[in-house]
Amino acid sequence: MELKVLNTGGTETGEVVTLNDEIFGADISEHAMYLDVKSILANRRQGTHKAKTRAEVRGGGRKPFRQKGTGNARQGSTRSPLMIGGGTIFGPQPRSYDQKVNKKVKQLARRSALSAKAQAGQIVVVEDFRLGEIKTKPVADILKNLGLAEKKTLMLTPEYDMIIARSGRNIEALNIMSAEKASTYDILDSQAIVFQKAALKKIEDTLG
């Protein structure tokens, strides 16, 4: 697949890049993408939830009232799960939600995600650019010129660029990162992917 390279003004530079078919034209494995995305989202969970059992709630655990003669159901402890202020049965406990996915499956998932975006025509290649200062307007103008101002966009740079990343931080629908850091979830969660030209080479080195 070939794509025309655009400048930051949104016009064609006359240059054409050829996308690597092993990465952007691969067979799409929905199952690999499912496993990787499920793992990414699960690994974000803190797992610090906690409910106290009857052994942990406050109180001495005395018998709340005598066994017979009150008309109430018998109770043996103020910490019983049946009492107000008592412990919780089978409540949530701290745990790790981490899910391991093999490296080959992760790479297959990323290739599948990029191939799906390429087939959908949601990949844009722009010439490499730099910003002189941290400022939102230049990045917003680039998105507008590319016709992506209203779309959830993933912008990939060859290396982490602090100035570009912080310039785009105030744009809610924009996510900026280096190409090698883009996960399957980042790719699938976007409506368009903007590659700086050098970022294509970077991702080919990572996934090739």
From Swiss-Prot:
Keywords: Ribonucleoprotein, Ribosomal protein, RNA-binding, rRNA-binding. GO terms for biological process: translation. Residues 46-84 are annotated as: Disordered. It holds the Pfam family Ribosomal_L4. Gene3D superfamilies: 3.40.1370.10. The keyword rRNA-binding applies. GO terms for molecular function: rRNA binding; structural constituent of ribosome. The keyword NAD does not apply. InterPro entries: Ribosomal_uL4, Ribosomal_uL4-like, Ribosomal_uL4_dom_sf. GO terms for cellular component: ribonucleoprotein complex; ribosome. Residues 69-80 have a biased composition (Polar residues). PANTHER family: 50S RIBOSOMAL PROTEIN L4 (PTHR10746), LARGE RIBOSOMAL SUBUNIT PROTEIN UL4M (PTHR10746:SF6). Part of the 50S ribosomal subunit. Belongs to the universal ribosomal protein uL4 family. One of the primary rRNA binding proteins, this protein initially binds near the 5'-end of the 23S rRNA. It is important during the early stages of 50S assembly. It makes multiple contacts with different domains of the 23S rRNA in the assembled 50S subunit and ribosome. This is Large ribosomal subunit protein uL4. It comes from Chlorobium limicola (strain DSM 245 / NBRC 103803 / 6330). The gene is rplD.
